[in-house]
UniProtKB/Swiss-Prot annotation:
Catalytic activity: L-glutamyl-tRNA(Gln) + L-glutamine + ATP + H2O = L-glutaminyl-tRNA(Gln) + L-glutamate + ADP + phosphate + H(+); L-aspartyl-tRNA(Asn) + L-glutamine + ATP + H2O = L-asparaginyl-tRNA(Asn) + L-glutamate + ADP + phosphate + 2 H(+)
Ligase in keyword set: yes
Identification of the protein by name: Aspartyl/glutamyl-tRNA(Asn/Gln) amidotransferase subunit B
Species the sequence originates in: Methylorubrum populi (strain ATCC BAA-705 / NCIMB 13946 / BJ001) (Methylobacterium populi)
Enzyme class: ligase
Taxonomy, superkingdom: Bacteria
GO molecular-function term, one example from the UniProt record: ATP binding
One Pfam family matching this protein: GatB_N
Cited function: Allows the formation of correctly charged Asn-tRNA(Asn) or Gln-tRNA(Gln) through the transamidation of misacylated Asp-tRNA(Asn) or Glu-tRNA(Gln) in organisms which lack either or both of asparaginyl-tRNA or glutaminyl-tRNA synthetases. The reaction takes place in the presence of glutamine and ATP through an activated phospho-Asp-tRNA(Asn) or phospho-Glu-tRNA(Gln).
SUPFAM superfamilies attached to this UniProt entry: GatB/YqeY motif (SSF89095), Glutamine synthetase/guanido kinase (SSF55931)
Amino acid sequence: MTERVDPKKLIKGGLHDWEVVIGMEIHAQVTSRSKLFSGASTAFGGEPNDHVSLVDAAMPGMLPVINEECIAQAVRTGLGLKAQINLRSVFDRKNYFYPDLPQGYQISQYKDPIVGEGEVLVDLPDGESITVGIERLHLEQDAGKSLHDQDPTKSFVDLNRSGVALMEIVSRPDLRSSEEAKAYVTKLRTILRYLGTCDGDMEKGSLRADVNVSVRRPGEPLGTRCEIKNVNSIRFIGQAIETEARRQIAILEDGGKIDQETRLFDPGKGETRSMRSKEEAHDYRYFPDPDLLPLEFDQAYVDGLASGLPELPDAKKARFIKDFGLSAYDAGVLVAERASADYFEAVARGRDGKAAANWVINELFGRLNKEGRSIEDTPVSAEQLGTIVDLIGEGVISGKIAKDLFEIVWSEGGDPRAIVESRGMKQVTDTGAIEAAVDAIIAANPDKVEQAKAKPTLLGWFVGQTMKATGGKANPAAVNALLKDKLGIE
């Protein structure tokens, strides 16, 4: 099968066009109260070494005990990724020395992971969609944290994070641009949050990305890849890929060769730096952990977890398009966060879905973004916004008045219907009152009347003047109809 090559995704070098090939390894911290093999807390923060059990500290004679909730969360995630769930998997020891790895090895999964192949459908900013293959998902322990800035001559180790369960989600090298990579991580984070298996908080390190980047001439075999470790924001993922691809292209066009290595991205300097030569699997001397039996469960266990899964973003998006008549773009915006989708659904229930979506996306999200607030922190409840949509639909207020009403509810709260009554915000629907205002505007502007007959677009000016004269309360449809009639405009 010929691989797709999108000319828009190619990077122009000094001599040739180049294709960047990207694979991702996402480390997602499992949402659970205790660690993968101990009962110590997974709470973020706290004093250094506050949440450390004897198992986490690798004290002699301490044996790991599997946390079943972490297993269930991994299976839920696999199901959410439409992946093969392996009924038998094995924990292995990954051997390497690092100061914040007290055992001298990490308990991970190598040959027999808990989750096999799956896929993620990713919507791109340009409206296209791609399918990214998932190679595997395995469980492993997180390491501790080395602190080098506490003392000029010493380094310290905080083991609070040591032993926390991670899901490493490995994609196939199916991504062909930094935009695709960012969209993939965004979609994966959305799925994890819907499932409740990882909070996706990159600032706290709950989601970290290792990015594998190589470049090649279109149609040629894969190039030598470099791995950029621990990129901790979606924006930085994009920057790291662009920077590393340019570095590799410059070397190749200069006649050099790419060394397979692990690199770090420095966002301050906008460059990647060599960290160490890239290890191969045999360097870690994997072997099954003798302290842990193979992990086995039956299909009934998987089916039980599957039955409890929530509606996921793709299914919710399809339903919003079908049930509420939304565009694919609007539905995509609304399902990007589960809380946003739930809010919209509460507003749209029993109402015009398109009108509800318009108010949620344009007015509410616009205001939240302006103030840097999240949907969970909105001062306008779904019930209040739904009432505003009702008042427009009932003809009680116009769209312009509705925006003023939204501002009042945002700032002061209260029942929108009661506010309209108490502040006299109802739109004028009395044709006689509107006609009087229209007649006054026409009488005061005879020159504009003549111009409007020759240039019908001037109707908008008359509408604006009439709305101004009525304090924005006149029914816009009635104003338009009267003006067209009196000015003789079709």
